[in-house]
């Protein structure tokens, strides 16, 4: 299953002019993204993939979004999401952390079946751009 999920995002991007992605930060929100659909003009539309946001993951854990939630905790969140969903996952990787750790993190995410990781092009302490603190 991880290998199927890993390539699913790439297939979607080849096959569709755009894809619908919704944030999920735990099993419940993943289940909602997995099952929700809407009918419009005779077509049923649903989400194609999930965005696992560091902001939402941190907030759900009662922590600030400053990379305080460690990688092991992020992996646990991803595993909870994967238990209830088959959709591709795009992970918010923040600044990527230490370069020495990034290779390990990417390999772990590949083994899990995460389709993409987004790394911010910033240096220094993580600051959430949604709060106007860049």
Name each model-derived stretch.
Residues 1-23, 27-40:
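N-terminal amphipathic alpha-helix/helix-capping segment at the start of soluble metabolic enzymes
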Residues 4-7, 64-91, 112, 132-134:
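Alpha-helix-loop-beta-strand connector modules within alpha/beta enzyme cores
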Residues 13-14, 59-64, 87:
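Glycine/charged-rich beta-loop-alpha catalytic/anionic-binding loops adjacent to active sites
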Residues 20-26, 50-52, 89-93, 117-119:
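Hydrophobic faces of well-ordered beta-strands that scaffold small-molecule active sites
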Residues 22-28, 69-76, 93-112:
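Glycine-rich anion/phosphate-binding loops
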């Amino acid at each position: 299953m991880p290998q199927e999920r890993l390539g699913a995002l790439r297939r979607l991007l080849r096959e569709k002019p755009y894809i619908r992605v919704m944030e999920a930060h735990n099993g419940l929100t993943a289940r909602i993204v997995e099952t929700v659909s809407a009918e419009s003009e005779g077509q049923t539309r649903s989400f194609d993939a999930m965005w696992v946001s560091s902001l939402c993951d941190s907030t759900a854990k009662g922590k600030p979004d400053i990379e305080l939630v460690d990688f092991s905790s992020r992996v646990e969140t991803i595993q909870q999401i994967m238990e209830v969903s088959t959709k591709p996952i795009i992970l918010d990787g923040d600044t990527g952390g230490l370069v020495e750790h990034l290779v390990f993190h990417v390999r772990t995410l590949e083994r899990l079946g995460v389709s993409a990781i987004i790394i911010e092009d910033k240096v220094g302490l993580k600051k959430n751009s949604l709060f106007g603190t860049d």
